[in-house]
């Protein structure tokens, strides 16, 4: 049986940009989305620029890869929030700039529309509590 790998704890973007060649989990607001395009290997790539309260400018560029166009993040508004787990921080432009890669093999993401609110992101347990603006009772989201 395969061993379950724990996701890295949730961190802020300003801390993530210092962790080159490491996998991180973070949450941010989508500031910009470039048009998805097909790669030479027939996978798809979508480039997002995200921000959080610690890194509002210029934001972090995240390249999201998937096998199909439909598996890419479907951003509706530029205030949507996105949670990434196990994205790899990397440098480019001779080490002057940092971006992140969301691999289709090890990374994942969860997208929250702008009217949803993050109530709490627990730094010790990687738990995220989201409110959708309704009076619905809380629901547990478990990972297997």
Swiss-Prot record:
Alphabetized Pfam families for the sequence: POT1
Which UniProt key words apply to this protein? Chromosome, DNA-binding, Nucleus, Telomere
The answer on whether this UniProt entry bears the keyword Nucleus reads yes
GO CC terms in record: chromosome, telomeric region; nucleus
Q: Which InterPro entries match?
A: NA-bd_OB-fold, POT1, Telomer_end-bd_POT1/Cdc13
> What domain of life does the native source organism fall in?
Eukaryota
Enumerate the GO terms in the molecular function aspect: single-stranded telomeric DNA binding
| Gene disruption phenotype | No visible phenotype under normal growth conditions.
Give the record's family classification. Answer: Belongs to the telombin family.
Q: What is this protein called?
A: Protection of telomeres protein 1c
Protein species of origin: Arabidopsis thaliana
Gene name tied to this protein: POT1C
